[in-house]
Amino acid sequence: MHGFHDVFIQILLLLAISVSVIAIAKLLKEPDSIALVLVGLVLGLTELPIIEDAERYITQSEVFQATIISLFLPILLGDATLKLPFHHLFSQKKTVLGLAFVGTFVSSICIGTAAYFLLDLPLAVAFTFAALMSATDPISVLSIFKSLGVPQKMSTVMEGESLFNDGIAVVLFKIASIYLLTYMEMGWAGLGSGVFLFLKFAIGGALVGLVLGYFFSQVIRVFDDYPLEVAFSALLFFGSYFIAEHFHTSGVIAVVVGGFVFGDYGAKIGMSKETKTNINTFWDSVTLIANALIFLMVGLEIRNIDLAGNWGVIVGAILIVLVGRTIAVYLGTGWVQELSSKERLLINWGGLRGSLSVALALSLPMDFAGRDQVLLLTFSVVLFSLIVQGLTLKPLIKKLGMI
């Protein structure tokens, strides 16, 4: 108990550091996620006895890393669905659907195939890594867009793509990390089984989210009590996730669909303006803490990454992911006439990898063959994405004249 108390105090200290970094980043009008990663890198590279146990607990504890998925994902995804008005999403449906569905599959196939042949990774490892790299994280991008006054269209596209491709990427991640080798041995029958499993995950998760989203939308019609309605939203997010996972479908897709129903239909029939404001404020605060811990953890993980002798494969992985993203964007949106070449370029470079990729990588079982390789490449690409792409995004937007 005494040891847990010490670790808790140290994690609290890390949270205090995180919140302080966020406050300073906001004063400087810089993306707080990038600032957190940079501070995490500094903390990870220096040995400070006062937070050493907390660093070890965050980066090596199986319990903590399992908690990341079951606790943080419903929070991050649920909050995002509440923030994106459905009519905004519908107005950009062609671009969002092209990126989220065509783009995610193309990205996964390109990255997985290249990683297998060029990086000489085992098949399951290559496509597990590819699934992780197919999920985008718009947090840093949206904060930059907001600070510069980039048109709402681009924010809607980036956030809409992320919400849908996160669900697809998680399903692909599960198939690649658990079932891929078995299906490969089955030949064409395995391909059919893989497609069936994907549809089961996706459709089953969507149905769970639809039912629970509708149910809680009806429930909040009865009450005009925002603390209670906040509690109902939490029950929806976590309930959707765990019920879907219990029935071996996609918890991520369940949260996204349930959140959209609740945030759009539920808000129209059962939320006062005050309630909607307070629900958004509550989840803003919770999401800030969750993201702070995840992005700080990305930086802290540097002490567990063996860079020596791996620079070649790391650079190769970064290039493969960048090329895979480019192919995915142009194939996924090539038929969308409303999208300009400048907008495609911004979408391409703004497809950062972040918290979901990290959370999924850490959730891999310790006995997964190639876990260390996946962690090495995932954290390396995420660091490059957040720091290099993130810090060059603002100059790119100005260069393209999109403000």
UniProtKB/Swiss-Prot annotation:
Changing E229K: Decreases over 50% Km for Li(+), without affecting Km for Na(+). Pfam families: Na_H_Exchanger. Residues 28-30, 87-98, 146-167, 217-218, 263-281, 332-372 are extracellular. One of its GO terms (cellular component) is plasma membrane. Optimum pH is 8.5-9.0 for sodium transport and 8.5 for lithium transport. Na(+)/H(+) antiporter activity is detected between pH 6.5 and 9.5, whereas Li(+)/H(+) antiporter activity is detected only above pH 7.5. It is a multi-pass membrane protein. Changing E161N: Decreases activity. Increases Km for Na(+) and Li(+). Residues 1-6, 52-65, 120-124, 189-195, 240-241, 303-310, 394-403 are cytoplasmic. The keyword Transmembrane helix applies. Changing D224 to A/E: Decreases activity. Increases Km for Na(+) and Li(+). GO terms for molecular function: potassium:proton antiporter activity; sodium:proton antiporter activity. The chain crosses the membrane at residues 7-27, 31-51, 66-86, 99-119, 125-145, 168-188, 196-216, 219-239, 242-262, 282-302, 311-331, 373-393. Changing H88A: Causes acidic shift of pH profile. It is found in: Cell membrane. GO terms for biological process: regulation of intracellular pH; sodium ion import across plasma membrane. The keyword Cell cycle does not apply. Changing D137A: Lack of activity. Keywords: Antiport, Cell membrane, Ion transport, Membrane, Sodium, Sodium transport, Transmembrane, Transmembrane helix, Transport. Belongs to the monovalent cation:proton antiporter 1 (CPA1) transporter (TC 2.A.36) family. Na(+)/H(+) antiporter that extrudes sodium in exchange for external protons. Can also transport lithium. This is Na(+)/H(+) antiporter NhaH. The lineage of its organism: Bacteria, Bacillati, Bacillota, Bacilli, Bacillales.
